[in-house]
Amino acid sequence: MPSDSDDVAAVKQPWSQLIVDISNFLSEHPQSKTSQALLPSCNGVWSDEEKLELIEAFGHKKQSHLTKSGVKAVLAAFEGDRTQPDVIFLCRLLHLIFSHFSSENDRKKEKYIVKCDVIATLTRITRKRIIMTLDVTDESSIDHNLDEVLWKLLHKIGLKDPRVSLKVRMGGLISPMCKLFIQKDTLPELFLPFFIKISRSPRNGQAIGRYEGFMTRLLVKIKALDASDQTSQVLLLDKHLQLLFFTMKNKRTRTQLLRENICKYLLEVLRRHLASSSNSRPTRLLSSLFGTFDKSLSAAHTEVVIGTIAILRLLSNFKKARDELKNLQVLDICSRELKEFWSDEWKTGPKSRIVDSLSALCLRCMSPLPYPLETRRFPIDFPLPTATPSTPGGHGRIRNSSSINISFDNGRSSDEDGMDEEDEAFVRDDDDEGKDDRGSDDDDGKDDDEINGALPKTTRLNPQQLAKYAPFFVENEQGTLQPTFSMIYQTNQESWRSICEKTRHVMPIHHHLPIEMFNTPTRIREKTAKTSNNMKKMIIEELDKPERSATSNQVIYDLDTAAFDGLPSPELPFVTGGGKLDTSKDLQFDSRFESGNLRMVIQVAPTHYELFLSPDVNQLRDHYQWFFFQVSNMRKSVKYTFEIVNCLKSTSLYSQGMQPVMYSMMESANGWRRVGENVCYFRNLYINENEEKKNVEEQKKKKYYYSIRFNVTFQNTGDICYIAYHYPYTYSFLNSSLSMLKKRKQENVYCREDVIGHSLAGNPIKMLTITTPASAAEIAAREVIVLSARVHPGETNASWIMQGILENLLCRQSNEMYRLRESFIFKIVPMINPDGVTNGSHRCSLAGIDLNRMWDRPNEALHPEVFATKAIIQYLCEVANKKPFAYVDIHGHSKKWDYFVYGNNASESWRADDVLDVGAAQLEEELHLALPKALEATCPSRFNASECRFNITRAKESSARVNVWRQFGVSTAYTLESTFCGFHKGQNSGYQINTSDLKEIGRDLLHSFLEMTKT
């Protein structure tokens, strides 16, 4: 048997000779060394230089000095009649290459390996290997080392390949894996993690669950593992429970499990492992003193508890299982466990998730309530114009407006849900999968065009159509030496009232908002709210109450009936300071003002109010998130509970310390501030019965509703307060702000305001051109930066970032701002979707669709906002011959902290041809990293580089970021995303974001453009 020193000696041969030997082996040269002779080289100690040489030779593209090289040659060597030692060596070689990637340069090679479809090759080999293993009667003849290496490689590379689930299914590996699981008691170490990974795909999970004998065998293994109290066995039980969760989502499998009394058994598992994971403090202390307390075992029991509750929550979605759980006294079990928890031991980490999960399970098993608005049609709509014909030269065809909108409003944003609430129970803190997957894990439902790389059809304007945008680029011919003061003074003569009255609405308006609501700074820095035990408290309170009856509730506010009642005419009033109290009434509500959103309020207890949000006008898909309402007639020092009950997202930052904002008319000098105690976010009891019936017929997902619940104790009796999802920013305030900023601007700043189009309601879509006065020749030498914001009305943080950009560019005296204006021409569209903003929508324009899914084929009649903005960029690229230095579209993100960007990296595209199209030279330049690198250099305390993503999915082809990159070749096209909540890094860590922070992000972005010029 060779010693360790012999192995090292084998590796110490001239490294270049080893590379040549491997190359000869790949080319099957007659004199080449065998795989058995080369295998010891995989076990040595390598220097960084040697690792780099190995990666260059066999982990990337072909090298001209070698007979066979590059990862494609390694993959090709797998094909044909290879011996077991050959396959082991090739797998070890791939694993070594993939394991040694560390630097950013290596990450590019890692992505290249994934693009070369290693998973497809490994899938074929593994499939053959499983079939051979199952046919062998003599276990001793099986080389288990090969199996371990294969599964290790599949798991490692599978975590990096977003299409691994599809490739495994298409490669026919699922059935052999199911058969192996059924027949073998002992499996390779990474078999189960990989099996769980691919079962996350709904289609794969259903196929596995339906495989004959699989569920029966899975339950047998679970029960056998449950009998052991060894840490390794409990951890293995956790993995099997994960597999059970992902494979029981189809009706046939659930029915089979219910026949086998799965609910009763899982409750027994829950009780047993809860007891093991939550030993009382005295017991733990004694165990620790005598050295008998096993922390790792307790942690393993905790994971089993979390997984078991997730399965019970999934089962409770279905009436038969829910009824069975109620008969088994699940509510009593959960209530008892919640009350027995040590309150100071369950504030963070996995065990706090047990509290939240038990609370959610309680809610699932309570009697559902009918959704009060299920049969009501929203009374406010807007008649849409007829769609214009497709742009000449484009590939579209004329369709009616509704079909155009429906075809486009079908893609989720990065901010929308991608997984079920229960699925998140299995994304663990130490799970690489949760961190490394940049795109969707599943390609289910994709057609052949997507798999084969066919691009969606796009349109562009012809020269005649582009000509009408020439007036917005007069600086190219005339320079910017002419002052624009005449227009500015005319605009500034307008009062706040006249600006408000010029804004066009579809939603009814009862009063105007005071200008002080927007121009009072919010400099107070408030910490994120404590969330520990909020859900527990709420659930225990609910369990102690008598069962609710919908008939006992009182409707306090109903926009459907009050929409146009009592509206002042012709001149709308401004709200006054309050101070009055009508003792005959409880709280009063209203949302009939610009950007307001509240449809109905139901009083369910003396101080508990349920609030229902209005839909986006004409919406084709439901969007409920943005709220902004007035509340009055309150009593001082009374704790009121507000519950927004028709949210749709399964998770929210409201469960992580975020609070709503409130503006008090009696304390207006304080501006907006964060309010709300005991804030929690959870799935409530409302079910849309019409949706449920429709889903039975159409096999679609049921619609559930989620609540934001919080308590507010008002400081003044009879006050008038406004409560909102985030700091409001209206279209009227934008117009007033532009007027004031141009009046205050520096003398050496050129600022021109153009109206590039009108929204469906007739609101002007404005664009600002900002630079310094210069001749036409000097203007020709300047690069152009295009910025846009507020395509999604509910993302008010985007407007506050834009406010910071405008204040700095127009009014700030600093060397940096002077250099920016001297170096660049800024084309800024501060609010793309004024109609959505004005009418209190969350995501849509009056066309009822997400405008950020219309960039590939905007229709001039239906989507004039995007049509005009895209035309500006096309004019720059094709007429002015000035491809933008950068394009940044500013957004808000409701699930993430800090701020970050999304860009476009061709090597991470859903379309394999993109890598070939852009060419190796451009990939090497890494232009897509220019802005994030600059932001990290200029503002590391707020910018979170780890949240940046550069993948390109098919669903995002119609977004601004991807379309500007693809159609116009702007490599530096980005989406900037900012949190609604707060910061997780730097000196701001633990604090909620305010408008001053958001303005500073705008300044950060401007500084980063200067940083980009250095590279």
Curated annotation (Swiss-Prot):
Q: Which GO terms describe its molecular function?
A: metallocarboxypeptidase activity; tubulin binding; zinc ion binding
Question: Which tissues show it?
Answer: In hermaphrodites and males, expressed in amphid and IL2 ciliated sensory neurons. In males, expressed in CEM head neurons, RnB and HOB tail neurons, and in gubernacular erector and retractor muscles.
State the phenotype upon gene disruption.
RNAi-mediated knockdown at the L1 or L4 larval stages causes a defect in egg-laying without affecting uterine and vulva muscle function.
Where do the segments described as Disordered lie? 384-462
Keywords on record: Carboxypeptidase, Cell projection, Hydrolase, Metal-binding, Metalloprotease, Protease, Zinc
What cofactor does its activity depend on? Zn(2+)
GO cellular component, as recorded? cilium; cytoplasm; dendrite; microtubule cytoskeleton; perikaryon
Question: One GO BP annotation here?
Answer: egg-laying behavior
Q: Where in the cell is it found?
A: Perikaryon; Cell projection, Cilium; Cell projection, Dendrite
InterPro entries, alphabetically? ARM-type_fold, Cytosolic_carboxypeptidase, Pepdidase_M14_N, Peptidase_M14
Amino acid composition bias (Acidic residues), ranges on this chain: 416-451
* Co-factor binding details: Binds 1 zinc ion per subunit.
Indicate which residues the UniProt annotation says bind Zn(2+): 792, 795, 891
Question: Where is each Peptidase M14 domain found?
Answer: 727-1013
Q: What class of enzyme is it?
A: hydrolase
User: From which residue to which does any coiled coil extend?
Assistant: none
Which family does the similarity line name? Belongs to the peptidase M14 family.
Put simply, this protein is called Cytosolic carboxypeptidase 1
Report the source organism: Caenorhabditis elegans
The upper taxonomy is:
Eukaryota, Metazoa, Ecdysozoa, Nematoda, Chromadorea
